[in-house]
Swiss-Prot record:
It holds the Pfam family ADK. GO terms for cellular component: cytoplasm; nucleus. Residues 133-143 are annotated as: LID. Gene3D superfamilies: P-loop containing nucleotide triphosphate hydrolases (3.40.50.300). It catalyses: CMP + ATP = CDP + ADP; dCMP + ATP = dCDP + ADP; UMP + ATP = UDP + ADP; a 2'-deoxyribonucleoside 5'-diphosphate + ATP = a 2'-deoxyribonucleoside 5'-triphosphate + ADP. This is UMP-CMP kinase. Its EC number is 2.7.4.14, 2.7.4.6. It is an enzyme of class 2 (transferase).
Length: 196
């Protein structure tokens, strides 16, 4: 069985992680966060990628696509090996740019089906406010204003064009993410109920 993938995109602080947790609970998807996989790999003793990942994340830059895809593929393979019924994945925070998308198409062509792109659309200032709030407790090294400005700049420059590209293919399901968590999830449920 091939993995079925929903790409989850949106700026920093759009609520991707929060909403993904709820989708997992309600629809039985497996949530893979590209960022979390990279952060975990960075901490893994003896990782061949650790230091490299650290430098990219600190600079607010996008990690080379080969690394991210190999981590995503490994996670999907492990999940499906453990339970063959679990073939539905939410991939959050990927693809971030054209290079990511080309890398995915090249590596995963015929190996995974992308059913749609879930896009959490949120005003930048709201996103920054949420991240700064989260930074007080998350301990994430990139939840500070300087890193955030860089991340939002990278997102607007690199990720928005990817969303536009999928939009033209009719694959984007857009959600207004500036509303409350419950209101946003209500809209998400409508989308998943319709898409099956």
């Amino acid at each position: 069985m091939k993995p079925v993938v929903v790409f989850v995109l949106g700026g920093p602080g759009a609520g991707k992680g929060t909403q993904c947790a709820r989708i997992v609970e309600k629809y039985g998807y497996t949530h893979l966060s590209a960022g979390d996989l990279l952060r975990d790999e960075r901490k893994r003793p003896g990782s061949q990628y650790g230091e490299l990942i650290e430098n990219y994340i600190k600079e607010g830059e996008i990690v080379p696509v080969e690394i991210t895809i190999s981590l995503l593929k490994r996670a999907m393979d492990q999940t499906m090996a453990a339970n063959s019924q679990k073939n539905k994945f939410l991939i959050d925070g990927f693809p971030r740019n054209e290079d990511n998308l080309q890398g995915w198409n090249k590596t995963m062509d015929g190996k995974a089906d992308v059913s749609f792109v879930l896009f959490f659309d949120c005003d930048n200032e709201i996103c920054i406010g949420r991240c700064l709030e989260r930074g007080k407790s998350s301990g994430r090294s990139d939840d500070n204003r300087e890193s955030l400005e860089k991340r939002i700049h990278t997102y607007l420059q690199s990720t928005r064009p990817i969303i536009d590209l999928y939009e033209r293919m009719g694959k984007v399901r857009r959600v207004d993410a500036s509303k409350s968590v419950d209101e946003v999830f209500e809209k998400v449920v409508q989308i998943f109920d319709k898409e099956g």
